[in-house]
Amino acid sequence: GVAAIVKPRRETGDIVLRFRMAEEAGAVALGLDLDGAGLVTMRLQGQAVEPKTVDQLKAIRKETKLPFIIKGVMTADEALLCLEAGADCIVVSNHGGRVLDGCPGAADVLPEIAHALAGCRMTILADGCVRSGVDALKLMALGAQGVLVGRPLCWGAYAAGAEGVATVLKTY
């Protein structure tokens, strides 16, 4: 199945609408991409985004019975706030380094986050520069329980559709 992770639009109703659409399409989990609040491109396109408080995240979490993912976590404190908000899973991610220049990578912060969540029932995923199974294993050795791979699959899809994605999967 596929998880649907949406951007942190200003209006909660916009987020809930996208959750409902994803549920109807068969999503197995729903989430919010917190680091998307820093994306200037969204604002330039007239899309209102904003950071969310723990109370706002709790309210959004109540809108679905599916597992709830929060993406864009980069500190142990943020991870603990996500736990408080009711997240089932976090994605340690710096959004490909496109939100803040000089931001550490997932591998830099994973050990501290994993330590902070030790013993908690929260899944820790990570993304960023996963180009091989070895890259995935490195992130998992640092505390992730799984990884996300996006950009190489997009390259394959743009280049040759489904066949391109299959080629990327076979190559990596």
Question: Model-found features: residue ranges?
Answer:
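N-terminal capping/small domains of soluble enzymes
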Residues: G1-R10
